[in-house]
């Protein structure tokens, strides 16, 4: 990736020379510690961070916010993902580790304290349903989701699936439901006007690709999945149901029997989560699907 040709890189390099390189080293060292690989090539997480930073820089300009601060929040937004050598551990919000790293690195770089405070607050409010809305966090939220959809987003889905050790079938079973659910509501999930203008096309492109992919998967491998849009009851007094789109097998992969599906939502560490259980009525084989539901509005 041609990092030094990015507008956000040139702007941050003028403001704090060497800062972007230090963030890069921190993220890539953490990812190599997780994967056990020592090659110097760009890691997936750094590549994604650069894409989100570039998009955040552009969105911030359109939204008349500080583009440098938005780019910094974006660069750090996934920096806590491999904390402790684990991928996306769910026992502690990774944004807390990201905020800690951001403060440490920005202070060492001599970045102004007011800017550090803005970055740390934005990171702590990002994907925290209980936190107050934050303009920088909103921009990075939108940029992050825009980067996950469209054709580059589809490519990243398969990279992440490989990183998690999934083959084609298990990637569809375990993770494609989240991609389909979020792609379907992408325009409504955007928090800034500038991002809403970009989201509709990315949503359509993503859904079109996955439908074609599932059709080809059936023809080439005999793996038959159906995309089903389902309404999931929510606990408590909330009348509105959650709508999800799942790629579900047409039949049990072990015996060809009928699959029974149980859907519910529950409160997770950072979000309201879908918990889907699949059980074959004939042989009893079980599978489960779990992911955070989109926050809309």
Q: How would you describe each model-predicted region?
A:
Residues 1-14, 38-65, 76, 128-238, ...:
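Divalent metal-dependent phosphate-bond-processing catalytic cores, especially two-metal-ion Mg2+/Mn2+ enzymes
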Residues 257-260, 288:
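Short functional micro-motifs and their immediate structural scaffolds
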Residues 52, 67-90, 94, 98, ...:
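His-Asp-centered metal-binding catalytic motifs of divalent-metal-dependent phosphohydrolases/nucleases
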Residues 252-255, 280-283:
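Short cysteine-rich clusters marking metal-coordination/redox-active sites
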Residues 247-249, 277:
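Residues immediately within or flanking Cys/His clusters that coordinate Zn2+
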Residues 19-51, 79-90, 190-194:
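Active-site flanking loop/helix segments enriched in acidic
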Residues 230-242, 260-268:
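Short Cys/His-rich Zn2+-coordinating modules
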Residues 265-277:
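Short linker/helix segments within small regulatory modules
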């Amino acid at each position: 990736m041609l990092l030094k040709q990015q507008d956000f890189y040139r702007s941050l390099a003028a403001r704090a020379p060497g800062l972007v390189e230090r963030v890069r080293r921190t993220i890539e060292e953490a990812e190599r510690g997780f994967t056990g690989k020592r090659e110097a090539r760009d890691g997936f997480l750094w590549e994604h961070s650069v894409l989100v930073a570039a998009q955040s820089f552009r969105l911030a300009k359109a939204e008349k916010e500080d583009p440098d601060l938005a780019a910094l929040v974006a660069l750090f937004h996934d920096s806590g993902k491999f904390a402790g050598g684990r991928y996306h551990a769910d026992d502690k919000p990774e944004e807390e580790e990201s905020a800690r790293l951001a403060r440490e690195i920005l202070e060492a770089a001599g970045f102004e304290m007011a800017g550090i405070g803005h970055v740390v607050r934005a990171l702590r409010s990002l994907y925290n349903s209980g936190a107050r809305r934050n303009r920088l966090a909103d921009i990075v939220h939108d940029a992050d989701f825009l980067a996950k959809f469209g054709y580059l987003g589809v490519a990243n889905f398969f990279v992440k699936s490989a990183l998690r050790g999934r083959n084609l079938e298990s990637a569809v079973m375990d993770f494609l439901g989240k991609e389909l659910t979020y792609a379907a509501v992408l325009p409504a999930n955007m928090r800034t006007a500038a991002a809403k203008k970009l989201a509709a096309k990315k949503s359509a492109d993503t859904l079109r690709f996955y439908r074609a992919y599932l059709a080809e998967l059936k023809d080439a491998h005999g793996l038959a999945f159906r995309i089903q849009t389902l309404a999931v009851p929510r606990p408590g007094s909330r009348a509105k149901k959650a709508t999800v789109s799942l790629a579900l097998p047409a039949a049990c992969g072990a015996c060809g029997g009928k699959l029974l599906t149980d859907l519910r939502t529950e409160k997770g560490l950072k979000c309201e989560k879908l918990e889907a259980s699949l059980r074959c009525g004939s042989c009893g084989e079980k599978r489960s699907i779990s992911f955070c539901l989109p926050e809309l509005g």
